[in-house]
Design a protein with these regions (language model features):
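Non-ligating segments of multi-cofactor redox enzymes
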Residues: 1-156
Length: 156
């Protein structure tokens, strides 16, 4: 596991690392959540959003995002533009497959992740060895159906 220079100096100098977060879909790139009552959080019927340190954060629980736009509409109605429909319906996160626990990687025929992905973001080498390609939107629908909980999400 490689350590970045920033992480090395932060540890060495006793500093705190910035908390990583996953921006939700339609994120404009800037936060304006100070004194906000977070209508986007309550608008998400799948409970995927939270407000932490005056930032809206995407957190996968048990259901993936269906890009219903309700969070962005609620944000715009509140006079904020943190979530705005002009921006991409993509969740900027790293989605990856834990090959040690993945059923397909370990010889069991399973393609539940590929079946549910409407973006065709999961490729298979034959019937085994799934991988996530560049079409991934970070919606986490594949995480929702993975029996072995082998699909993981990390902040970039």
């Amino acid at each position: 596991m490689s350590v970045s220079r920033r992480e090395l100096f932060t540890k060495f100098l006793g500093g705190k690392t910035a908390q990583k977060f996953i921006a939700p879909p339609y994120f404009c790139g800037e936060f304006n959540c100070v004194d906000c009552e977070a209508p986007c959080v309550s608008a998400c019927d799948r409970e995927l959003l939270s407000l932490e340190n005056e930032r809206v954060n995407f957190k996968f629980k048990s259901l993936g995002c269906n890009f219903c736009k309700e969070c962005a509409l609620a944000c715009e109605e509140a006079g904020r533009e943190v979530l705005n429909l002009k921006f991409t319906a993509k969740i900027e996160a790293k989605i990856f497959i834990d090959v040690h626990s993945c059923l397909a990687w370990n010889g069991t025929i399973c393609c539940s992740c590929q079946d549910v992905c409407k973006f065709r973001a999961i490729d298979f080498l034959g019937v085994f060895r799934p991988s996530i390609n560049q079409k991934c939107t970070g919606c986490a629908q594949c995480m929702e159906v993975c029996f072995a909980n082998s699909i993981k999400m990390e902040a970039l």
